[in-house]
């Protein structure tokens, strides 16, 4: 139950790379139904995100693996090296 509470608290947070550049806003969290583990974050990319353009993210919504998350506070920080246009 704690995982779901944390997931609800994370929704709507801004997502930044570990280089301090904004990617977008967290809109959903995908959880494995069997294990209950968080698998991916669904992020709505900001239209003016320079980081997204540099990485090659052209879709409006992208899946970012939860393993890329390095910190969560007022914002979510993800490791840019683990985010790719192939997600």
Protein language model annotation of sequence segments:
Residues 1-87:
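Peripheral interaction segments used for macromolecular assembly
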